[in-house]
């Protein structure tokens, strides 16, 4: 399958290449002006591609040959419904979207996740001071330094990791480093263990149903396939 992609170099382009352990595929994800392009293929396939800049027409060009069974998708950003929260396979993309687009997203799920900021402020105090002075997130190694900072927390309290990641993503969007947001969102969402994702989803459901005043860190015999806790949609659970 031959392909040829040409994009105006003056447009905003975010690209991410990673190996998905869940799908056992190599994934190339691009975002151009709020449109997502995804290319997925098996890791043992030969892929012959190259990326170049054409100075004559000021465009970035991607050319190559992909296996016949390659999956190519194109999706325009769409609102997320509360029903996705009840599907364990959809929760990870919800978190990735929250981290990636913290400045522009809205809705009850995301508003609930924003309450986790209080945990971060309580633990670290001045967030700007943490990002600018301690972690230096705007430096050339800022993305890697941040990932190293939170990696040991991922298995302890995913609430802190999600909150910090969304806040640093918000910071990068404001400082013209938006290209880092997608890479961070994909990495964090894929690094949080299934048990921690289930714990966070369980407590988020409880909060959205009004059973708790905050998103707690409890996990009372909740099986990931058991959606009884998240079965009813109340007025508090409108579409995002």
UniProtKB/Swiss-Prot annotation:
Q: Name one GO biological process term.
A: symbiont-mediated suppression of host cytoplasmic pattern recognition receptor signaling pathway via inhibition of IRF3 activity
Keyword Ribosomal protein among record annotations: no
Q: What induces it?
A: Expressed in the early phase of the viral replicative cycle.
Q: Which UniProt keywords apply?
A: Early protein, Host-virus interaction, Inhibition of host innate immune response by virus, Inhibition of host IRF3 by virus, Inhibition of host NF-kappa-B by virus, Inhibition of host RLR pathway by virus, Viral immunoevasion
Keyword Methyltransferase included in the entry's annotation: no
Output the Pfam families linked to this UniProt entry.
Poxv_Bcl-2-like
Q: How does it assemble?
A: Tetramer. Interacts with host MYD88, TRF4, TICAM2 and MAL.
Q: Which family does the UniProt entry place this protein in?
A: Belongs to the orthopoxvirus OPG176 family.
- Protein task: BCL2-like protein which disrupts the host immune response by inhibiting the TLR4 signaling pathway leading to NF-kappa-B activation. Acts close to the plasma membrane and targets several host TIR-domain containing adapter proteins including MYD88, TIRAP, TRIF and TICAM2. In turn, blocks the host NF-kappa-B and TRIF-mediated IRF3 activation.
Name of protein: Protein OPG176
Q: Which species is listed as the source?
A: Monkeypox virus
Q: Which gene encodes it?
A: OPG176
